[in-house]
């Protein structure tokens, strides 16, 4: 059983948010934290999600169907991009808040965090928001290949102390942690991956 990702639908406005009966795991993080690269690593494909060096490139809510497990990974717009207009930032903040609070199928928030950086206020705010609304967190440290082993361990401990959950260390380029992340995402969605099916293809 190979795991595959398919971009099934895209939403740009509140009205376009569709209700899917299947479980959903939201992917959120600061602009340029590496969400698109992580989606591609999970899919085992290089071009499923568009990757850009320009912060804030993802400006939509993208619903990726995970087969054959039948749940969605929902890629939310990156936040914290200072060059975006105030009205644009406000628009996406409202979209994010409505999705996180009104989607009955949402099972967890996968919060992407740059392994190289200290905890950022916007990340802390989103983690607190999720916890205040009873939304389970799956913290993910991205770009772990840029840090040495001591730095990785320190960052994991730091975030575990903050959110109460040890983050999954990942690297999209080396595929570090991708198999474990699939297990964590599936568990959060309420499904099980048998050992022979861990690798995304």
Curated annotation (Swiss-Prot):
PROSITE patterns: G_ENGB
InterPro entries: G_ENGB_dom, GTP-bd, GTP-bd_ribosome_bio_YsxC, P-loop_NTPase
Residue positions binding Mg(2+): 36, 58
The keyword Metal-binding appears for this protein: yes
Gene3D superfamilies: P-loop containing nucleotide triphosphate hydrolases
Chain ranges of the EngB-type G domain: 21-191
Protein task: Necessary for normal cell division and for the maintenance of normal septation.
Name of the protein: Probable GTP-binding protein EngB
Species, as recorded: Desulfovibrio desulfuricans (strain ATCC 27774 / DSM 6949 / MB)
Taxonomic lineage from the root: Bacteria, Pseudomonadati, Thermodesulfobacteriota, Desulfovibrionia, Desulfovibrionales
